[in-house]
């Protein structure tokens, strides 16, 4: 019996779209949205809207977009958002946002790898804290973040509306570089 070859995985910063990147990114986002993990979207927007979103987010100077690939195909993404320039008091903290892996690509460690690459990029950019928030219904994401050392510091009881009902959302932070928390 021949063993199936192990798929190749990679995570990289996406600075421009080449080849089938835009198509793959839209397909992966669509699959994640349909699977309930659409980083804010609850229903799939028209394709031209999604394409404009991805083209546009790459142009935002305060954002870095990262892509996860399975066998060379984009299957997920995350963004590192810098604080606005007028918020000097919180210049130490960046935001991990818009994080997803398409359901068909889960189980290969890409979600973890994606978060770790974003953490490294945040640290390299001089940030000492990474913040994120997540809907209470995203159990796998919560398990991932808590397993990577993110600390839940609060819950908003009416964070989002899904299927006509309000659901809670949780706020997390992580000190980068292993710094101790202030006492």
Report residues per predicted region.
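Conserved GNAT acetyl-CoA-binding A-motif
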Residues: 115, 122-133
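Acetyl-CoA-dependent GNAT
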Residues: 12-104, 115-117, 121, 175-178
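C-terminal "cap" of GNAT-fold acetyltransferases
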Residues: 3-7, 94, 128-131, 135-142, ...
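Structured loop/turn residues at beta-strand edges in well-structured enzyme cores
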Residues: 73, 125, 165
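Short polybasic/polar patches that bind polyanions
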Residues: 106, 123, 146
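Active-site acidic-Proline motif in GNAT/NAT acetyltransferases
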Residues: 102-104, 108, 136-137
